[in-house]
């Protein structure tokens, strides 16, 4: 599944971390200062990102990238029928179905979230060919670490 993710996504990937993304951003800032160029950053943190993953869309995405139907079905069965309740000072509310989100603490959740987020970014038009900051012949317009995204560009 890592082959579906671009280099700009460092979240939950072996040998990658937040330090890499911070170093990339610092390097861009230093080069911009050195060459007296204006650059812009937009920092985005998706609130409750893991809880917002729509299951039906996730299964569609997995199918589109070529995940075998048997595996998608297995993942669907893991998520199906999940229920929750809320306990408060006066008791608990009725149980309700959970129709969104990837399981917190599940070893597959980070990978599933990354694939879901990548689909959103691709559909937002943030491909490498779009405007960004040219680094080694490539346009880099965003850096990501799981649900944290930094959009970048210059005037």
Segments from the language model and where they lie:
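Nucleotidyl polymerases of mobile genetic elements and RNA viruses
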Residues: 1-155
């Amino acid at each position: 599944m890592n082959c579906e993710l671009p280099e700009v996504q460092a979240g939950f990937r072996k040998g990658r971390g937040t330090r890499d993304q911070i170093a990339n951003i610092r390097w861009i800032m230093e080069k911009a200062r050195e060459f007296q160029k204006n650059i812009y950053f937009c920092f985005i943190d998706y609130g409750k990102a893991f809880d917002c993953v729509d299951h039906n869309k996730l299964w569609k995405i997995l199918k589109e990238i070529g995940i075998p139907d048997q595996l998608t079905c297995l993942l669907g069965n893991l998520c199906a029928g999940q229920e929750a309740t809320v306990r408060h000072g006066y008791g608990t509310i009725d149980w309700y179905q959970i129709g969104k989100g990837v399981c917190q603490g599940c070893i597959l959740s980070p990978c599933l979230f990354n694939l879901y987020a990548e689909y959103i970014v691709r559909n937002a038009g943030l491909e490498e060919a779009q405007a960004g900051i040219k680094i080694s012949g490539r346009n880099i317009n965003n850096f990501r670490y799981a649900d944290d995204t930094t959009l970048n560009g210059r005037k």
